[in-house]
């Protein structure tokens, strides 16, 4: 999805210069993909960072990752050890460009395959999967042979769990999106040396690495220790983390922009060159993260915030898997709706028509030029 949007954002003038007789595959390989490749590679590396963050979050549900160690140390009050785990995690993310290089990719893939081959499938109870599919997820009225009670059961679940959880989820997500947009708008220039200088860009990278390294769940967990259980920790965690991600991606694009020889520096360059040229990617990334923020807002319910995840966790804790499945389905429908709405807004704003490219005066589509 994102790679498709990156292609949409790339300059299409080389495609037009090839003329109508060139086949689609050649157009893609020689006119579209080369322009989008740097952004695609940056995004692929970012997805690796997402995988590292997700692995850490899975530690909170029992997997022996760094998140498991962090949660254990916090529960035991060993804050020094928890700080060491966080330092290791930040170092792992900050050095990802050193240990994940293209020439090392094959070696990492072989290493991963060897590690996976040593993992044994955990034992499951006899018939556990079939029981889950044939009994646990079946609504209680149908399991009890009372189909007439299905609609009242759904209505009660909707009014007492889904609607309140959805309202809280949307409130948290919208406020977090506004904060993320504000953070990204400023952060995109913080890592560009021509805007903030080498020292400023280095400090900007450090701040963004820290905010990007910690999963939203971890940040919210830390903020809960300061502000207590409320929507504020979730809003701050989601806004800062997603804003840092968007700002990092935009900053990488801004650093790679081709500028004129007499281009200014500092805030003048940021306000009059970088912001207009990256407005399309800024809107596209914000709308893309909007859908993700919705899902993450729901997950925040596990920490006690009354979003959809709170009611989902409550249903699972009571072993009422049928209620949990309905809440999950509602969350999925909301996510699909937000995705459709974000696409419509992006098309309405024309974000896909604002390409990041360099103007070439006098170029005529379909004709070769002295590039």
Q: Residue spans of the language-model regions?
A:
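Transmembrane alpha-helix boundary and packing residues in multipass membrane permease domains
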Residues: 43, 55-59, 68, 189, ...
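Hydrophobic alpha-helical elements at and bordering transmembrane segments
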Residues: 48, 70, 162, 166, ...
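N-terminal, non-cleaved signal-anchor transmembrane helix
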Residues: 89-205, 350-371
